[in-house]
A protein has these predicted regions:
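Positively charged n-region of N-terminal signal peptides that target proteins for export
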Residues: 1-5
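Bacterial N-terminal signal peptides
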Residues: 6-16
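A short, compositionally biased domain-edge/stem linker segment
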Residues: 14-24
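Active-site segment of extracytoplasmic enzymes that catalyze sulfate/phosphate-ester chemistry
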Residues: 21, 34-35, 42-131, 145, ...
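Active-site-proximal cap/lid insertion segments
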Residues: 24-30, 37-53, 73-76, 99, ...
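Generic enzyme active-site microenvironment
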Residues: 36, 136
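Catalytic metal-binding/acid-base residues of hydrolase active sites
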Residues: 40-41, 90-91, 139-140, 208
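Hydrophobic anchor at the start of a short beta-strand
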Residues: 132-133, 201
């Protein structure tokens, strides 16, 4: 399978999809994998200048693809961002200005309980055009009684967390569930891609990591057991230096965060390798 990495502007893509849905051209339609990591800062990767974290697979992706360094974010919060990615709309258009929580908290903030499933989405437009569509990983676009599942928004294949009728539940039975979650998500993504390798397909791969609470496995932590991070490293800007300088235990906290990022990178590397083999 030809593996071409490109980060593109979804608003432009949505404008193009109106034509795509009406005039499908099988030979020219690319397969798309949209990887969304959770709470990974713009410089939390080696290629972006981080002095300690190891991300060889993301480094390779950035070197071979397109790295966009100037951007605008309508909302940096979880659910509004996801709404924007799916719809290409400002989240405020859907009254989604904060993360979805309990219905009581949603009402106090004058928010709906979920994204209206009647809203056209990237997935629903691609599905109309003949794409096989999948959502794998974190959802966080509505939960609780009556909340639609990702299938209602145009996804054929769904393996999700943080939503109604979740495929995986982070219920505390496995203290390392979050630490191992990217591996589970990548397994399902590879399975879906292999079953639809003749395309076209669209996949959301939305990870839980490196969002807190983080609890890497002992094996994941080994990579950083001898690290001695410095809060005043010249690679960090003034705000980051101040933030790290206030850490209660900089070494321990850095080990946990960096180990989580590196495992994320390792699992994505498995996905990239699988794509190269197809």
């Amino acid at each position: 399978m030809k593996f071409q990495s490109t980060l593109f502007c979804l608003c432009v893509a949505m404008l193009q999809l109106a034509t795509l849905a009406d005039e499908p051209k099988p030979s020219s339609r690319p397969n798309v994998i949209f990887i969304l990591t959770d709470d990974q800062g713009w410089n939390d990767a080696h290629f972006a200048g981080h002095p300690y974290v190891k991300t060889p697979n993301l480094d390779k992706l950035a070197a071979e693809g397109t790295w966009l360094r100037q951007f605008y974010v309508a909302s940096t919060v979880c659910s509004p961002s996801r709404c924007g990615f799916l719809t290409s709309h400002y989240p405020a258009r859907h009254l989604i200005h904060g993360h979805f929580a309990t219905h009581e908290l949603n009402e106090k903030r004058h928010m709906p309980h979920w994204l209206d499933p009647k809203t056209p989405t990237l997935a629903s437009l691609l599905k109309k055009s003949g794409y096989a569509t999948a959502h794998i990983g974190k959802w966080h676009l509505g939960s609780g009684q009556g909340a639609p599942t990702p299938e209602a928004y145009g996804f054929d294949f769904v393996r999700h967390t943080t939503g109604n009728k979740s495929y995986w539940e982070e219920n505390g039975e496995d203290p390392y569930f979050r630490a191992k979650s990217t591996s589970l998500f990548v397994d399902e993504t590879i399975k879906f891609i292999r079953e639809n390798k003749d395309g076209p397909f669209y996949v959301n791969l939305w990870t839980l990591l490196p969002h807190a609470k983080l609890n890497p496995t002992p094996e994941q932590l080994k990579e950083y057991e001898s690290i001695s991070p410095q809060a005043d490293h010249p690679a960090f800007g003034p705000r980051m230096k101040k933030y790290l300088g206030n850490a209660k235990n900089l070494k321990n906290q850095s080990q946990v965060f960096y180990a989580s990022l590196t495992d994320l990178d390792t699992q994505l590397g498995r996905l990239f390798a699988a794509l190269e083999e197809m």
